[in-house]
């Protein structure tokens, strides 16, 4: 988890208020109408997130244009707080294959995924299969500068971190921010679909993986165009660790010092973040398009600097016309937003 410098004074209270196993391990308000994009033979395929639905949908469309994938979450849903409708729970339990992210990302689906496993469905949890990294692997290490000033706050932060690990796991579930890992995910999905649908699915998994790798080269060029000394990220929650790992960025701090949007920052956390932004001369806070940016905007204002709040597509694709309608365009759009904000 991103570690930062502690400020000597607390932020005002108003700021807070503004606040490799392919096992047969089966797995804001939801919309009753799931998006469809029927699968191999008569199999029923369900993907949890819009990102997985995009990748799986491309594979299925390549192998059998008449087949579909049902995506549970609507565009704009935050996977961390998504709660399924009764109809969606039934879709999960009745599915032959559920493609989930795992590692605690879709906490609201845990019971339904467990029931699906019990009923004989295969639940393919992608994140644990693509070499996940621990939270905070690319956090800023310079926070030691102020460690002695805030021992009490550090104790509280340790307690919060422990609670977060219990809820969310110690491994980061946001694997889609490394496109090479998602290329591997496409191959895994294709291989799993091929077990019931034939070799065309494996071949199409490979084809989609190659498309992802080709697109990753462009994303890499965009992100690497940012000078090394400007590759400093402040985000709404700890979601960009894989991007930082893949492209040489540093996570200097997070508005919510957690791997989930469900946590809440303390006044000390926010004071710490304001200090980091000022000290590092960070020009932008990257928010989540699926969540209100009020707290990030309050932090930006408290710095007294010209700090932009830039909304990224973090856990969901964008609406039609957003430039983030599928996984590849989402990553390209996010890369451009990051590069533009950090080089202005």
Q: What feature does the model see in each segment?
A:
Residues 2-15, 21-344:
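Extracytoplasmic metal-acquisition and chelation regions
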């Amino acid at each position: 988890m991103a570690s930062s410098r502690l400020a000597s004074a607390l932020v005002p209270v108003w700021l807070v208020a503004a606040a490799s196993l392919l096992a047969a391990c089966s797995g804001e308000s939801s919309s009753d109408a799931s998006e469809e994009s029927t699968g191999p033979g008569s199999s029923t395929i369900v993907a949890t997130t819009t990102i997985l639905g995009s990748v799986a949908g491309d594979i299925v469309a390549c192998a059998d244009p008449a087949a579909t994938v049902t995506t549970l979450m609507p565009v704009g849903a935050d996977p961390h707080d998504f709660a399924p409708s009764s109809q969606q729970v039934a879709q999960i339990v009745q599915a032959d294959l559920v493609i989930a992210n795992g590692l605690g990302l879709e906490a609201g689906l845990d019971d339904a995924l467990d029931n699906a496993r019990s009923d004989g469905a295969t639940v393919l949890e992608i994140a644990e299969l693509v070499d996940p990294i621990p939270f905070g692997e690319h956090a800023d290490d310079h926070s030691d500068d102020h460690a002695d000033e805030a021992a009490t706050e550090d104790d509280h932060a340790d307690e919060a971190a422990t609670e977060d690990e219990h809820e969310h796991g110690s491994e980061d579930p946001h694997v889609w921010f490394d496109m090479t890992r998602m290329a591997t995910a496409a191959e895994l999905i294709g291989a799993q679909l091929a077990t019931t649908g034939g070799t065309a699915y494996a071949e199409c998994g490979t084809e989609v993986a190659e498309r992802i790798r080709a697109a990753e080269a462009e994303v890499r060029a965009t992100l690497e165009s940012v000078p090394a000394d400007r590759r400093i990220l402040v985000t709404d929650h700890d979601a960009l660790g894989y991007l930082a790992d893949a492209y040489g960025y540093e996570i200097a701090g997070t508005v919510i010092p957690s791997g989930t949007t469900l946590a809440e920052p303390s006044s000390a956390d926010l004071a710490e973040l304001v200090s980091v932004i000022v000290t590092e001369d960070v020009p932008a806070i990257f928010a989540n398009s699926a969540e209100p940016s009020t707290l990030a905007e309050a932090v930006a204002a408290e710095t007294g600097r010209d700090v932009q709040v830039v909304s990224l597509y973090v856990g969901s694709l964008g609406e039609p016309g957003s430039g983030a309608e599928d996984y590849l365009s989402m990553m390209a759009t996010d890369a451009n937003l990051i590069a533009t904000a950090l080089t202005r």
